[in-house]
A protein has these predicted regions:
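Active-site and adjacent substrate-binding regions of carbohydrate-active enzymes
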Residues: 1-335
Length: 335
């Protein structure tokens, strides 16, 4: 079968050089994961594309509904549960073939700096290999393309024609395509607020996102509270030897799954637990996690605002995301 062919390819190529390989694989089955990314699997990892096809319609983009926070949460958790400790998925929010993650997974009108950091934290702290796509660390959003001629991607132009055929006018069709087009992830990187975002003095292959005046690297590097600095903090936390056992190797255990628009999970380790929690609501929330009672919780990362975990209750502001270290009373034996 296919796995036999992939193993032959791996034997003749990747394994000879101990190469690290990541597969683009859709519609995988749980029972096949061992063959793909287990200890003797064909690949080292698989990109997690499950979130990118939420609400996908065979009719096309015009029939695709916006992603709700609950859908994102459950899809992420379904993948984490299916993979378990078989191997490590390559976790993404966006890539060169997708629209910008903050525009896809954060409801319109709520794409603040805080919300973007919250989404980044919820994804970055999962079990697996976090991948950052250029511009993600700045919170780059989808581009407001002025016309279909500004879009280069052939599939996006096909979707535009499909929209027109089902009765949408040109403005409506452009709005649909602008939301889903892969060209959103291909606009020039926004280095500063100068012409063309500082990317080039020439003519770029695609238009520069007009938001470059406000969203650019120069305005965020070294600035306390910026999205860029938050991502640096997340990288530093994942590289911290004190938390390696939990964040790198620990299992993911979702909690509060019945709490609408609250996404929370534990990373379990021998030395400590890590609690990652985010509030997608546009208002403050208080949730109860009984196992926190009597335990010391220390904030490791916070996207802004005050946050308390007292007597098993966690208070979150609107669109707040927090990473806690939960200290264990005694060392846990992980099998």
């Amino acid at each position: 079968g296919v796995v036999d062919l992939l193993n032959e390819m791996a034997d003749r190529t990747f394994r000879k050089h101990q190469a690290f390989t990541i597969a683009e694989l859709f519609n995988w089955r749980k029972e096949d994961l061992e063959s793909y990314i287990g200890d003797e699997g064909c690949f080292s990892s698989i990109f997690d594309f499950a979130e990118t096809v939420i609400n996908a319609s065979p009719n096309g983009w015009y029939d695709q509904k916006p992603v709700e926070p609950e859908q994102y949460k459950q899809t992420v958790f379904d993948v984490q549960k299916s993979v378990g400790d078989v191997g490590y998925m390559a976790n993404i929010i966006e890539n060169h073939d997708e629209s910008r993650g903050v525009s896809r997974y954060i409801p319109e009108g709520e794409r603040s700096t805080e919300a973007k950091k919250m989404l980044g934290g919820l994804s970055f702290m999962l079990r697996g290999l976090p991948f950052l796509y250029q511009g993600q660390e700045l919170g780059m959003e989808n581009c407001a393309f002025p016309s279909i001629e500004a879009i280069d991607d052939v599939s996006s132009r096909d979707e535009y024609q499909r929209c027109l055929k089902v009765g949408l006018n040109e403005e409506e069709a452009l709005k649909v395509v602008s939301h889903y087009s892969r060209d959103n992830g291909r606009t020039p990187f926004q280095w500063n607020d100068e012409k063309n975002g500082g990317f080039t003095t020439g003519t770029p292959w695609l238009m520069v996102n007009p938001q470059y005046k406000d969203i650019n690297a120069a305005s965020q590097i070294g600035k306390e509270g910026s999205i860029y600095e938050f991502y640096k903090s997340m990288i530093a936390l994942r590289r911290d030897d004190r938390y390696e056992d939990t964040i790198v190797y620990g299992v993911t255990e979702p909690v509060l799954e019945d709490q609408k628009d609250i996404m929370a999970y534990f990373r379990r380790g021998e030395k400590q637990d890590i609690l990652v929690i985010g509030n997608f609501r546009d208002e403050a929330a208080e949730v109860e996690i009984p196992e926190l009672k009597g335990k010391t919780c220390q904030v490791l990362l916070n996207n802004g605002g005050t946050c308390m975990a007292v007597d098993g209750k966690v208070k979150l502001e609107a669109l707040q995301g927090v990473v806690f270290e939960v200290k264990l009373t005694k060392k846990r034996t992980v099998v």
